[in-house]
């Protein structure tokens, strides 16, 4: 029966050993494998022993891959499994590795959710909705998602959300109704709930200088009028222009006044 004739430390990796049977190189083994089987020179090993050693070493190599992957940041089961699958590690070994990671608390979904919550609140302008999606994508259980999303919403300072809203609002020009609509949409895209958005909207100042609004209306009038003048003329052109500007949030009386001011219609002409 085969006998272990030499066990030597690998030159490039001091945590692994070369195992020789009957003076021939057999395989490399992990430090933990070496200790686990209490391997030593002169030990007799049969085929069944070698199969156990090989399987255990494959498992230990997979554990080390997982530990290396987890060393950069917190991960979930789903993320570790995907990483190990890319390394073409068998499903049975992966399952054992995940069990090991949980036993050693290397993977903890509650800790993961809590850490992500704190990081996102401190470093991003995103709301609970985006937080929920990130946890779902990472494979966190729904019960944990619900608990930590609620904590996220409770812990995120309202003044921070208002700052985000003000930053967005500065970039949105035009009628108040449209600015409100665009701000609401932008906040929803960032993951804020209807309830939070309603509170924020009540805190916002949507006022704009009248001269600025007047200038914007003039610009929009010229664009809309020129666009429809390619297809329409006369009363139809005027009505299409008014409809187009009202869809953009401008009020009828302001549009009518601007049409008259621009000389497109006179003050005596009725506009439908």
Curated annotation (Swiss-Prot):
CC terms in the record's Gene Ontology section: cytoplasm
Subcellular location, record wording: Cytoplasm
Keywords carried by this UniProt record: Cytoplasm
Q: What is its main location?
A: cytoplasm
What is any one GO biological process for this UniProt entry?
Answer: regulation of DNA repair
Coiled-coil region list: none
Q: What does this protein do?
A: Modulates RecA activity.
PANTHER family on file? REGULATORY PROTEIN RECX FAMILY PROTEIN
The record's comment on protein family reads: Belongs to the RecX family.
What protein name applies here?
Regulatory protein RecX
Question: Organism source for this protein?
Answer: Staphylococcus saprophyticus subsp. saprophyticus (strain ATCC 15305 / DSM 20229 / NCIMB 8711 / NCTC 7292 / S-41)
Gene encoding it? recX
């Amino acid at each position: 029966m085969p006998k272990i004739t030499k066990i030597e430390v690998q030159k490039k990796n001091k945590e692994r050993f070369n195992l020789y049977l009957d003076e021939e190189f057999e395989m490399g083994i992990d430090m933990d494998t070496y200790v686990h089987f209490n391997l030593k020179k002169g030990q007799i090993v049969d085929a069944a022993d070698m199969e156990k050693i090989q399987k255990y070493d494959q498992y230990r190599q997979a554990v080390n891959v997982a530990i290396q992957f987890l060393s950069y940041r917190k991960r979930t089961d789903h993320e570790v499994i995907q990483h190990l699958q890319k390394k073409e590690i068998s499903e049975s070994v992966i399952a054992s590795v995940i069990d090991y990671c949980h036993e050693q608390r290397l993977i903890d979904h509650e800790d993961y959710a809590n850490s992500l919550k704190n990081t996102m609140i401190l470093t991003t302008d995103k709301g609970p909705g985006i937080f929920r999606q990130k946890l779902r994508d990472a494979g966190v259980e729904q019960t944990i998602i619900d608990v930590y999303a609620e904590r996220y919403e409770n812990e995120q300072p309202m003044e921070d959300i208002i700052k985000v809203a003000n930053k967005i609002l500065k970039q949105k020009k035009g009628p108040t109704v449209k600015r409100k609509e665009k701000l609401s949409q932008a906040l929803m895209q960032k993951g804020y709930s209807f309830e939070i958005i309603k509170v924020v909207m009540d805190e916002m100042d949507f006022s704009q200088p009248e001269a600025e609004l007047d200038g914007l209306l003039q610009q929009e009038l010229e664009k809309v009028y020129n666009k429809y003048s390619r297809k329409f003329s006369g009363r139809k052109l005027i009505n299409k222009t008014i409809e187009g500007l009202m869809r953009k949030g401008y009020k009828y009386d302001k549009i009518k006044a601007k049409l008259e001011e621009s000389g497109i219609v006179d003050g005596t002409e009725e506009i439908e």
